[in-house]
């Protein structure tokens, strides 16, 4: 069951209730990179959920050749949720990718692969349910610069929490002068942990 809607009819009711202006159809490639197609809400009808949304799959790395580029996105209404960051009210809908040439789910679509794996688990009797627990860990940088030219290649990252900034004179703030050493940023409290408020905002946004 979806968190906000459980059917296509509920989807349109939910969009009307929240004055949704745009529908963002999303899918991922083989390495998990997000891709999307955005439609004006007024251009969407139930037929898009039944027949799908066409797109050019040759634009996705390692997917389709140009002569067989036409593919279909099948929206999953139960996956819909409001985008908390867009200026205009936008609803995000995850999609399955369908191969119109074979008349089946696309073998390079991660959602299709997961669904086939679940079906195999049940049909083989190995299990009836699979649980996935992604570990959401990432770094927050203030600046990332990359150079890849014929005469040089480098990257440079910066963060206020980096110990190389112990003596930096911050123009728009003050320097606490106390920072974790390399690999020393696990479990410290403020002021060493400067991301408390950011994490709290992320959690609250995810729970909405």
Where do the model's predicted regions map?
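Glycine-rich, acidic/polar active-site loops that bind/position phosphate-bearing ligands
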Residues: 1-208
